[in-house]
Amino acid sequence: MPMYLLDGKRIWVAGHKGMVGSAIIRSLASEDCEVIVADRQKLDLTRQEEVEKFLLKEKPHAVIMAAAKVGGILANDTMPADFIYQNLIMEANVIEGSFRSGVEKLLFLGSSCIYPKYAAQPIREEALLTGPLEPTNEWYAIAKIAGIKLCQAYRKQYGANFISAMPTNLYGPRDKFDLNSSHVVPALIRKAHEAKIKDLGCLSIWGSGTPTRDFLYSEDCSDALVFLLKHYSETEHINIGSGGEISIIELAHIVCRVVGFKGDIVFDTSKPDGTPRKLLSSERLVSMGWRPKTSLELGLAKSYESFVSNVADN
């Protein structure tokens, strides 16, 4: 399929105020296109009628579905109904509404948690649905898998050019730094910052510190998404990863160095670790000519700067 040109296109970014959505807006600024956004107060994505009216009125040529209810292990464990229902209903409404309103192309943003807990590493796209999920985030994962299948179903039945991309663990400006709902990177940044400010002697972290993860800066992810919107039109979902992995304990040491916390790091092994290892294979995306640009330490420094400027006193 030929390249999808963005020149003169109207592109709706759903979830534009989130970490990824806001990064997508910045990436699209260099394209000759018109970006459409809608605040939550004006458009409730869980209301099908509102979504369809918005799409029929705005008539976007392309849609990037970056809106989602997200959170870490604690949030997923305590609010399973919210995580599965809200994500299912939002993605179904946006995908169905996009089809009904004649959207030319849709990019659905998933998550690496869709893969089995013990998938062979690095995880390739074909590992989907080959084994049981990680129990600590299965509710969110099931909703995201459904989003992939919705895109594939509309393509199969109607020929819709709907694609899906699965990024690895993301971090960056506008991340969620609330300890009750955050992922590991923003949680570590907040904990290290507060430990430094309070002059604490140690920093306590969930789990053993041994699991390894693949982390990607949000600006690199948004760059990949715009690249895929232009160059990818296949049925199968495609991974977006950094190409490297790091243990949680190594990550914690880098965060402490960036933040300036000089105390000890202790691990609370009574808390769950989650999946022991998760590294995405980005071989397909790299073969198309895309690569990430931001080192982990630089990305963490930018994330901490954003946290201090916008969140630290809240």
Curated annotation (Swiss-Prot):
CDD domains according to UniProt: GDP_FS_SDR_e
Residue sites binding NADP(+) per the record: 15-21, 109-112, 144, 167-170, 183
Organism: Sinorhizobium fredii (strain NBRC 101917 / NGR234)
Catalytic activity: GDP-beta-L-fucose + NADP(+) = GDP-4-dehydro-alpha-D-rhamnose + NADPH + H(+)
InterPro entries per record: Epimerase_deHydtase, GDP_fucose/colitose_synth, NAD(P)-bd_dom_sf
Pathway(s) where this gene product acts: Nucleotide-sugar biosynthesis; GDP-L-fucose biosynthesis via de novo pathway; GDP-L-fucose from GDP-alpha-D-mannose: step 2/2
Function recorded in the entry: Catalyzes the two-step NADP-dependent conversion of GDP-4-dehydro-6-deoxy-D-mannose to GDP-fucose, involving an epimerase and a reductase reaction.
A Pfam family hit: Epimerase
GO molecular function, one term: NADP+ binding
Superkingdom of origin: Bacteria
GO biological process, any: 'de novo' GDP-L-fucose biosynthetic process
HAMAP family assigned: GDP_fucose_synth
Protein name: GDP-L-fucose synthase
Presence of keyword Nucleotide-binding: no
Active-site feature positions: 140
Residues annotated to bind substrate: 191, 206, 213, 273
Family per record: Belongs to the NAD(P)-dependent epimerase/dehydratase family. Fucose synthase subfamily.
Site entry (Important for catalytic activity), positions: 111, 113
Native organism taxonomy: Bacteria, Pseudomonadati, Pseudomonadota, Alphaproteobacteria, Hyphomicrobiales
UniProt-listed Enzyme Commission number(s): 1.1.1.271
Record keywords: Isomerase, Multifunctional enzyme, NADP, Nodulation, Oxidoreductase, Plasmid
